[in-house]
Amino acid sequence: MAPSGCPPSLPLCVCLFLASGFAQAGRLLVVPMDGSHWFTMQMIVEKLSHRGHEVVVVIPEVSWHMGKSLNFTVKLLLVLNTLEDLNYHFKFFAHNQWKTQEVGMFSLLKHSGKGFFELLFSHCRSLFKDKKLVEYLKQSSFDAVFLDPFDVCGLILAKYFSLPSVVFSGGIFCHYLDEGAQCPSPPSYVPRILSKFTDTMTFKERVWNHLSYMKERAFCPYFFKTAVEIASEVLQTPVTMRDLFSPVSIWMFRTDFVLEFPRPMMPNMVYIGGINCHQGKPLSKEFEAYVNASGEHGIVVFSLGSMVSEIPEKKAMEIAEALGRIPQTLLWRYTGTRPSNLAKNTILVKWLPQNDLLGHPKARAFITHSGSHGIYEGICNGVPMVMMPLFGDQMDNAKRMETRGAGVTLNVLEMTADDLENALKTVINNKSYKENIMRLSSLHKDRPIEPLDLAVFWVEYVMRHKGAPHLRPAAHDLTWYQYHSLDVIGFLLAIVLTVVFIVYKSCAYGCRKCFGGKGRVKKSHKSKTH
């Protein structure tokens, strides 16, 4: 009998709901990337686990932020490097950005970033040498692989176990998105990654955009040489990066058209920008006190991301000087040496609740490195930005926000205290910046489904249907000349030329018959009269 006060059908409905949930539960292999990439991916993984799926996450034993969780199974990968090695390679890369910003992909990946990527690639080799782990993964009979393609290993695992895959990324290096998803990317109006161009390019910029694409095709195979060698060794057959990317079932990107410029998409591409945004939580007593003490001037939130903890002393002092010139209270997440000229209005903290502070009514501006997480938290909370991009897609993100009139971009190498002061005063006092960011916030929030729910749906979709082959374009099966219809153009051109040739020959023959014969008759007639 149903409990008193409850509808008789309620327990039955609950049982049916739970039964259907368990019936749909599956097994998911997750191959993430460390750092800020993991923060948003973890949200999806945890929700999938809460929905009853058996989730297994493979992570290296040495990492910054990835660790054990009670919500899903973690398999540790034994690696040769230590945490000190990881920190050394990343700090070497990050510190170089304060000396000379490596804007182009060639310089970024070939120089300071090369050692860091080689370290990541080595993790994949270690994984396949762990026969016990590989056998466990093989026997687990997963329904799909949810992966970050940054280090390529997830793609190799998906191909090795012949599993459908869902890619989760902020963007794909090189031209492999064009080839892997067969997604058109016309260089005439789709800026290449790291180019800092907009979708409205001058002739000179379009030339450089085309050259960037050509450089990608020439250089990227060299950069991913180690990854391809590992894949070929593991799969026991020669493969290319295109071979690894082509089988992807769903491409999931941490962006949307509020940030991204309008461009072509494929049916298996999903935009989930702002997945890290959430309703601001009440501040702790410490931060609430800081905010309340700011008075009518409000606060400015300053963070260069979780991966940048130190700034060269001279640059830190320039920044501190600029911050001391504005009336707002500055909350600066910084773990480096305290600048000697730090003003009273600037508070250094080792950690801050960034989203919660940006969601406070007293937030006036946001100084950010333009990472996708920070950019979207700024958009969601409607806070204008002063952007100081350092590397990677941060340059492109800053350009997009600046183009939309929602912030000001500064070159961290060349900026002075005056530049930072003026930029802050501009975004705080010029109402257009606040109006523009509020408009973007309104556009971003006006959607039929939350990004997190959309991401979970598509992962489960691939698990249920063992992939999404009906969304795979036939372009994957065409050769390059078939894709561009060069064979059709050649065939039609041959027909046209043949017809023109026949018509020409026919006309020439007719002319000879008509006019050539009359000439001979007249000539013969004249000779007789003489």
Swiss-Prot record:
<feature type="glycosylation site" description="N-linked (GlcNAc...) asparagine">
    <location>
        <position position="292"/>
    </location>
</feature>
<keyword id="KW-0325">Glycoprotein</keyword>
<comment type="function">
    <text>UDP-glucuronosyltransferase (UGT) that catalyzes phase II biotransformation reactions in which lipophilic substrates are conjugated with glucuronic acid to increase the metabolite's water solubility, thereby facilitating excretion into either the urine or bile. Essential for the elimination and detoxification of drugs, xenobiotics and endogenous compounds. Catalyzes the glucuronidation of endogenous steroid hormones such as androgens and estrogens. Produces dihydrotestosterone (DHT) diglucuronide from the DHT after two subsequent glucoronidation steps.</text>
</comment>
<keyword id="KW-0732">Signal</keyword>
<keyword id="KW-0808">Transferase</keyword>
<dbReference type="Pfam" id="PF00201">
    <property type="entry name" value="UDPGT"/>
</dbReference>
<keyword id="KW-0256">Endoplasmic reticulum</keyword>
<dbReference type="GO" id="GO:0046226">
    <property type="term" value="P:coumarin catabolic process"/>
</dbReference>
<keyword id="KW-0812">Transmembrane</keyword>
<keyword id="KW-0443">Lipid metabolism</keyword>
<keyword id="KW-0328">Glycosyltransferase</keyword>
<comment type="similarity">
    <text>Belongs to the UDP-glycosyltransferase family.</text>
</comment>
<feature type="signal peptide">
    <location>
        <begin position="1"/>
        <end position="25"/>
    </location>
</feature>
<feature type="glycosylation site" description="N-linked (GlcNAc...) asparagine">
    <location>
        <position position="430"/>
    </location>
</feature>
<dbReference type="GO" id="GO:0005783">
    <property type="term" value="C:endoplasmic reticulum"/>
</dbReference>
<dbReference type="InterPro" id="IPR035595">
    <property type="entry name" value="UDP_glycos_trans_CS"/>
</dbReference>
<comment type="subunit">
    <text>Homodimers. Homooligomer. Interacts with UGT1A1, UGT1A3, UGT1A4, UGT1A6, UGT1A7, UGT1A8, UGT1A9 and UGT1A10 to form heterodimers.</text>
</comment>
<dbReference type="GO" id="GO:0008202">
    <property type="term" value="P:steroid metabolic process"/>
</dbReference>
<dbReference type="GO" id="GO:0015020">
    <property type="term" value="F:glucuronosyltransferase activity"/>
</dbReference>
<dbReference type="InterPro" id="IPR050271">
    <property type="entry name" value="UDP-glycosyltransferase"/>
</dbReference>
<dbReference type="GO" id="GO:1904682">
    <property type="term" value="P:cellular response to 3-methylcholanthrene"/>
</dbReference>
<keyword id="KW-0472">Membrane</keyword>
<protein>
    <recommendedName>
        <fullName>UDP-glucuronosyltransferase 1A8</fullName>
        <ecNumber>2.4.1.17</ecNumber>
    </recommendedName>
</protein>
<feature type="glycosylation site" description="N-linked (GlcNAc...) asparagine">
    <location>
        <position position="71"/>
    </location>
</feature>
<keyword id="KW-1133">Transmembrane helix</keyword>
<dbReference type="GO" id="GO:0019899">
    <property type="term" value="F:enzyme binding"/>
</dbReference>
<dbReference type="GO" id="GO:0005789">
    <property type="term" value="C:endoplasmic reticulum membrane"/>
</dbReference>
<dbReference type="GO" id="GO:0001889">
    <property type="term" value="P:liver development"/>
</dbReference>
<dbReference type="InterPro" id="IPR002213">
    <property type="entry name" value="UDP_glucos_trans"/>
</dbReference>
<feature type="transmembrane region" description="Helical">
    <location>
        <begin position="488"/>
        <end position="504"/>
    </location>
</feature>
